[in-house]
């Protein structure tokens, strides 16, 4: 790749406006997703009746039906190639993503999942942004990404011999898929609502396979547990959370993925309070590194090469 690179301060990026609103949307998504790790870990770790397959069915069975009228109304106005890009969105934030992440949460704590999926997603988004959009992080963002990488590496290495390796691998696969989906959404110019509707509606394809598998525990679940999971999975985590994050991407561009690294902080606190998953010294240091990294990543600039 040839050309010159000029660093643009984050507050003056010329390709996006509405920074304050973008931060608000990003923080809304962060709050919802932090709780999702705790709520989902509670279910799939044996504390509840529902399993990973049930949670994914609730998540997209409900949100897909809610957003189906939206997609039908907006379909004629979608940009060319939107349906092709939608496949990337489904893989990176739809039913396959949610199923792999939920299965990983059976094997590793909520704090690990939150650190290794939304925590490392900015690293993958930065890499794919460089390849597909010609973006390069400035010095401050680069330092932030380095701190995120260091925190994640410390967490993985410290628990490599404790049976959590498969869970960690699942979390990192999800982070990579999410990162490329984010970049491709930006490149395609999809509006936040369109991207969310495409992801949730196309993920409805999971439901028939779920029903035919005979793996459902919905009828056996207590009404209270079913109601909590239906609202959190089907409305908050999918429709509201995805819409908020996609809106943040539209307003903040390359800086939006950085805010997701705040999720480990809130998820770790929530898991300690509600699930008795008290972090050890390594987890605390890793989360601190990730939190510092996201702050630098959000404040730093982006270089456009070309």
Which positions does each model-derived feature cover?
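Hydrophobic/aromatic residues within transmembrane alpha-helices
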Residues: 43, 55, 59, 104, ...
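Helix-helix packing/entry segments at the starts of transmembrane helices
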Residues: 58, 94, 98, 112-120, ...
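Hydrophobic alpha-helical transmembrane segments of multi-pass integral membrane proteins
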Residues: 20-28, 52-70, 85-88, 144-147, ...
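Membrane-interface helix-cap regions at the ends of transmembrane helices
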Residues: 35, 39-42, 46, 62-81, ...
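Specific transmembrane alpha-helical segments of multi-pass solute transporters/efflux pumps
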Residues: 32-39, 68-117, 126, 154, ...
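Hydrophobic transmembrane alpha-helices of multi-pass small-molecule transport proteins
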Residues: 6, 67, 128, 137-157, ...
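A helix-boundary/kink motif common to multi-pass secondary transporters
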Residues: 48-52, 109-110, 133-138, 191, ...
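Glycine-/small-residue-enriched transmembrane alpha-helix faces in small-molecule transporters
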Residues: 1-57, 150, 158-187, 206, ...
């Amino acid at each position: 790749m040839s050309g010159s690179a000029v660093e643009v301060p984050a507050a003056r990026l010329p390709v996006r406006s509405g920074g304050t609103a973008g931060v608000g949307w990003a923080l809304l998504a962060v709050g919802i997703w932090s709780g999702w790790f705790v709520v989902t870990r509670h279910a799939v770790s044996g504390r509840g009746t529902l399993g990973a397959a049930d949670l994914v069915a609730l998540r997209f069975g409900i949100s897909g039906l809610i957003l189906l009228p939206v997609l039908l109304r907006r379909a004629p106005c979608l940009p060319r190639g939107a349906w092709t890009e939608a496949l990337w969105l489904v893989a990176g934030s739809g039913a396959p993503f949610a199923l792999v992440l939920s299965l990983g949460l059976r094997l590793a704590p909520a704090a690990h999942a939150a650190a290794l999926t939304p925590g490392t997603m900015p690293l993958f988004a930065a890499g794919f942004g460089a390849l597909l959009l010609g973006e390069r992080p400035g010095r401050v963002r680069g330092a932030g990404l380095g701190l995120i990488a260091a925190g994640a590496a410390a967490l993985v290495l410290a628990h490599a011999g404790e049976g959590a390796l498969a869970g960690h691998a699942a979390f990192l696969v999800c982070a990579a898929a999410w990162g490329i989906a984010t970049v491709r959404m930006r490149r395609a110019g999809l509006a936040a609502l369109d991207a969310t509707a495409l992801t949730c509606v196309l993920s409805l394809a999971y439901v028939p396979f779920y029903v035919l598998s005979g793996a459902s525990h919905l009828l056996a679940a207590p009404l209270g547990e079913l109601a909590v999971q239906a609202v959190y999975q089907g409305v908050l985590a999918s429709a509201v959370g995805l819409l908020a994050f996609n809106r943040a991407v539209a307003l903040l561009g390359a800086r939006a993925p950085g805010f997701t690294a705040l999720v480990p902080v809130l998820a770790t606190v929530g898991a300690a309070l509600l699930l008795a998953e008290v972090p050890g010294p390594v987890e605390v240091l890793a989360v601190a590194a990730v939190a510092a990294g996201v702050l630098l990543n959000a404040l730093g600039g982006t270089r456009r090469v070309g």
